[in-house]
């Protein structure tokens, strides 16, 4: 059991080291893009399925509430939280439309729309990101594995270099925390 724990912790460290080596510049670009958008009166929309839905909610909570600094709330919406909206859209239009329909209703030009997908192939996330781009939003993918089909349709992809879902999710939440920290420091010096 201890060997398994040690192996998992080692694998987690390797992913974090890869983020530093391979994605630091992209993380900085993501933070700058989001800070500029929020400073300009725009909002963050974020989505994902399963564990990525939880990460979307976590991200929105840090932006609306606070991360580390006492500050005013900033506009962010997790498109994963309203069961009535999700089930109505899913029932009437299908599961692939649950995020796209919300982007249609809520996204404005200049907003930042983030799709989180460990595979990079979540169809409902992909469809929403495509519509967001059509509407003039900036699109970001927090992805895993090889980035999947989403990698090619977003303005900026942050693909965690791992094929192991738990390690990808750990990479995503680390990126989210770093971005929240950088956004707060930039907007509330």
UniProtKB/Swiss-Prot annotation:
Its main location: cytoplasm. Pathway: Carbohydrate biosynthesis; D-glycero-D-manno-heptose 7-phosphate biosynthesis; D-glycero-alpha-D-manno-heptose 7-phosphate and D-glycero-beta-D-manno-heptose 7-phosphate from sedoheptulose 7-phosphate: step 1/1. Zn(2+) binds at residues 58, 62, 169, 177. The keyword Metal-binding applies. It comes from the Bacteria. The reaction produces a racemic mixture of D-glycero-alpha-D-manno-heptose 7-phosphate and D-glycero-beta-D-manno-heptose 7-phosphate. This is Phosphoheptose isomerase. It comes from Geobacter sulfurreducens (strain ATCC 51573 / DSM 12127 / PCA). The lineage of its organism: Bacteria, Pseudomonadati, Thermodesulfobacteriota, Desulfuromonadia, Geobacterales. The gene is gmhA.
